[in-house]
Amino acid sequence: MWEWSTFPQTVPRNQGEIMTKSRVLRGAIAALAATGLVTGAIMAPAKAATRTTVVIVESNALTSLNPSQADSNLVINGDIAYLTSMGFNYYNDKFQLVRNTKFGTYKIISQSPFKVEWHVNPGRVWSDGTPVTAHDLLLNQMTASSAYSKAAGLGDPANTDITPAFNSLGYTSLYDTQVTNVSITPDRLGVVLTYKSANADYELIGPSVFPVHTLVAMAAGEKKLGTPAHNVALKNKFLTAYTTKDTATLKKYGKIWSESYLVTSVDAKTNPLLLVGNGAYQVESAVKDQRVTLVLNPRYNSGEPTSGITKIVMNTITDGPAGIQALANGEVDVWAGQATADGKAALSKIAGVNVKGYATLSYEHTDVRMGDGPGEKDKYTGIFAPGTTAASQAQAKDLRTAYFLAFPRDEIVEKVWKPIGDASAAWDSLNYPPSSPNYAKMIAANGSAMYREGTQASRTAAALALVKKYYPTTSADKPTAKVRILWGQPSNTRRISEAAIIKAGLAKAGFDADVTPVSGWSAHISENKYDAMFGGYGISAVLQKGLTDNWQSGIGQDMGYSNDKVDAAILALSGAKLSDDKVFANYLAVEKEVYGDAASMNITMWPGVSAAVNTLQNFKPSPLTPEVLWNFWEWKF
């Protein structure tokens, strides 16, 4: 039966952070070229006699064991990390931040300056038996502190032309802008973070937890697990390099962190140091584009005890109907793919399966390129290139505006999203959901009116007039203004439909849209050869700054957008707790600039659909990423 949870009426001030980055790409590898995959290839069938294995359908494929690396910001990678690592807190399905006291504690120890002590419980260990200590809480200094990166000679993350030694998503995060000092506690089990000011979201601006001894070992060429005593010595080497800012040594660690975890398969040849974690499960194997198998970590003591599930198998089935058929056949236990109307209907007909519909905090959006992507060597010269003159910048803005005017958002919502969730609607705020009491007030003032007033036909006519100013021979019949749009895989039914609607809609405004799908598209977002993109983001945390840092200048700005007023508003939202009125004012400042610059448009919030066999207990998806996995330790048959 269908169960619809309610979207929170309070403002979801949510900018998800996996490690230190705000959002994770939804369905970024929603369909690899694996259309030949058949359900018979699925391992560990759900009907096996032993009921200690859970088999999950994934529409993504593993690309990295490090989701904080700049090209690895994918939901599947984050899901694996969620199962294999534990930190100081997590979100439940009620938007409540829960402290993980099995792992450690944190507390405010000073209001002025604002200091928080983060402390690991004694006896916590990594999967190789090495103690978890303060050393393992220091990596954020390299992966999320621009100040430390510059001081240690690891590169200036603000320089988008040169990739820093740690190619991380964390720069420009709250950790980067708010943490001013890190010190180690006398017992070497904790760190004290000093913040720029009292911070509303300090609980989400803590240290990452990473087995730093593995970086030191791999940098030295080691390819097997060491003893705890050996690894403690390696930790101390890391600490020395950190405290002395040993540039050469830290760069070696950065190379390992940035490159070695980019794996698509795991087998006997894989360096076991890459698989060390403190989570409930460890990656046992991974077959490229097919499946990832995780087994219990026998040394796990950093979180809630599991309830009987000893193995989790995540099978990549990129074809939606095939995944649903696998559930119907009893070959898998959990389906959490990208739903379609037909898929929703098919799920509802499967006996012995609980189908859950819920409002997620994942959403569909489209962005246009405003400038060079970080690390791009060649300048962006596409249709939206702003150039250096007032005339060229005006032309670029006109063409961007035309793109959004002609973008067939309403048709996409009606034909693709409403059949899945009746409440689906075009989303005109960049922060507040339609259910928020602030939504109407925001969209009346943020500059989005031009993209919803009149009919789509009248908006498209206005768009065509703008395009013809610069492409006088273009027409709806023979569009000549070329725009290259980045999106996902050809076997993703939803995206196929969207791409076709977008191409046809933009053609009416004189745009000749190239909507060729790209394998592993999320790794290409920063590339200057693409003029625009559309896709989905998943949100994993609730922060005061909301979704605003999608438009923050710097290395995390894939589309080359930069606006001083936007950056100032984001900075104001990143500090002390603000009143609702001040939060609204800063959100409005951001939205007016982004809409005024014709930089971005949200399409709709995703209706969530997932399903599980009714013998799997405690299956209760959360609106926040990682959705179905958030309480995996409670699962049992």
Predicted regions mapped to residue ranges:
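Long beta-strand-rich cores associated with HINT superfamily self-processing modules
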Residues: A612-F637
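Extracytoplasmic/periplasmic ligand-capture domains
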Residues: T20, D93, W118-A152, T270, ...
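Tryptophan (W) side chains
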Residues: W2-W4
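Surface-exposed binding/hinge segments that line
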Residues: P157-W257
